[in-house]
Amino acid sequence: MSDLTRFTQYEHLDKVKKVVAIGGGHGLGRLMSALSFMKSRLTGIVTTTDNGGSTGRIRLNHGGIAWGDLRNCLNQIITEPSTASSLFEYRFTGQGELSGHNLGNLMLKALENMHIRPVEAIHLVRELLHVKSHIFPMSESPVHLAAVLQSGASIVGEVGIDNLTELPKSIFLVPLVKATPEAIEALQEADVILFGPGSFLTSILPPILLPEVIEALQKSHAKKIFIDNLALEQSPAASLSLSDRIQWIHHTVGKEIIDATIVPTNANDLCENLSLKVMVRPLQADDISYRHDRSLLSQAIDDLLGEL
């Protein structure tokens, strides 16, 4: 890790007992990495609806949950790279059936095939990689994301939804599965709950569609913060302003739950129509402009907690 987050003292985050981050993809992995200094006080609830890439091929041929985002989060919060972590992230090249597959995905799928609970499979890998933070799938049952289009037709599959040319009317889960019990327990015990950054429709929203998650969020007294993206999404969600996305969450949950949001300095929506705190900060990483700098992000969260 190139930043100094694990050596920095945080006035507010150091006092927080439990933080839960909800999402998927690279966004959640980046956030978990930024907060990895919190170790066992940090929990990620990860979207498991992916049907693209190596994960999609495994699901198509062998069924099961989507392991890719879980694997990515595990890999991003490793503070001490090792042969084991390199092996876990190894991706096959060349020709043939293994080409493009990630070894970590295959390892996790193998554990699933051995009838080991996904939560236990992740725990085994956490121990192998010396990861202290907790990571739970949104559900331990196979599930896909679906959408109702403006025409009234429906499509199933995260990849298809990301490739839509218009915003869907609504999204839903197929089938409507049960949430992972440990994820619900983490939400119930959380002092801070973070949403994003990441793809809004396909990474952030899926866990919030689970009835048990909705109930936990409705009852939670935790501070709830939405972290905005640094660049426009390459998906139908690009047509949604920050206010639109927060209101979509509120509509899904059935309650206005977001207390604050963190936005980059180039943000064009400061949510003036919503009753929440907005923190504007430079957040871009030096190497990749659309990725959050870990140190800047963790400091922004810490400062915002001091104002809530």
Swiss-Prot record:
* GO molecular function terms noted in the UniProt entry: LPPG:FO 2-phospho-L-lactate transferase activity
Q: Say yes or no: keyword Cytoplasm present.
A: yes
Give me any GO biological process, just one.
regulation of cell shape
Coiled-coil annotated spans: none
* UniProt xrefs under Pfam families: CofD
Q: Which top-level group of life is the source organism from? A: Bacteria
Instruction: Give the record's keywords alphabetically.
Output: Cytoplasm
Major location category of this protein: cytoplasm
What this chain does, per the record? Required for morphogenesis under gluconeogenic growth conditions.
**Name used for this protein in its record:** Putative gluconeogenesis factor
- Organism field: Pasteurella multocida (strain Pm70)
